[in-house]
């Protein structure tokens, strides 16, 4: 029986059965980071969402059949401004932030994409597409800039499903007396005086650099061709970024539909307000790493809500994710778990537009099953289902011992445990209690055994 994967398509505003153009060559493009600042956890939601989508598509079509491209934007005005502010070179800044992004993705358990192109390495492709747009009268040169003529693009508002006036309400538009229309956007901009040489490139229109939107059109075309299956990104990219990508790509290649399925993840909020660098209410992934919050906890938090819904970041949500993982790891402790086929109900939850809240509930039900099982065989089956399902969504990649003792100085604790045993041996109950309480303050629980030994675990 053929697997049916239903995925919400922003373009049609409905859930559609995912049917790639070629089942042996499934193509997926996701907008990656602009590497000027350490990614905040809101940026990283996109990384986790599309990592899960990648895993599902691989499960259906096979790893060799799927090509996943996620770009790095390493040419941008924000990069120039921040490098100047920090007093570092462009390359120093972009290299440092790119490495931090990779560490963040590893921390969150994300698989590597098939290809990770950098914008600066594809300037020639961008120039070629811009030249096509000029030749087809979809772009024009004005005041040393190259602009895309928005009114020349058929169905420009299709993705956002709003009229042109509504789309541009509240959106900053760079005004220029030389533009044909106020909404026209930059494909190529000239270099400014005293700008870093490695942020500008030779072109038929003089020294300059590309606009943001043309970068993704060029890199997707280079690695996936005129048409591909999935384009992903945050909901904030629907307009103007993805709208402009569609317009310029379809106009450059008139027979192209560009991406068939458009997938967008919701915002991360803090106290109900969108998390963003401009608002200053953001928390970087590095902040969470420095607090020794395990990556699996953050990943489960990001998967706890449906990917299209807003998700509010708060300490309680992180604590709840930690408690859930503790419960799952406790359920498989001291059980000989084995990988089994993915349970049908679990897989069906993910095949229904990546319904991760239901998937998490199903794993919780298996954990409950372990604790109420009447036979060892039943316990083992439930525990095996837990680890199989959790592994599939990128969780529970440690042993229970590693999980519960992560970040713990075992040598230090064992020394205190032995010191307490000596105190008990000499009936120094006061010292024994002091050591127990000291460890309890450090969230280490001692359990005295009938044979006189003591075992410990992290709370």
Curated annotation (Swiss-Prot):
A motif ('KMSKS' region) lies at residues 274-278. Zn(2+) binds at residues 31, 216, 241, 245. Monomer. GO terms for molecular function: ATP binding; cysteine-tRNA ligase activity; zinc ion binding. One of its GO terms (cellular component) is cytosol. Its EC number is 6.1.1.16. It comes from Rickettsia rickettsii (strain Sheila Smith). The keyword ATP-binding applies. Keywords: Aminoacyl-tRNA synthetase, ATP-binding, Cytoplasm, Ligase, Metal-binding, Nucleotide-binding, Protein biosynthesis, Zinc. Its main location: cytoplasm. Belongs to the class-I aminoacyl-tRNA synthetase family. One of its GO terms (biological process) is cysteinyl-tRNA aminoacylation. It catalyses: tRNA(Cys) + L-cysteine + ATP = L-cysteinyl-tRNA(Cys) + AMP + diphosphate. Transmembrane segments: none annotated. A motif ('HIGH' region) lies at residues 33-43. Binds 1 zinc ion per subunit. It is found in: Cytoplasm. This is Cysteine--tRNA ligase. The keyword Secreted does not apply.
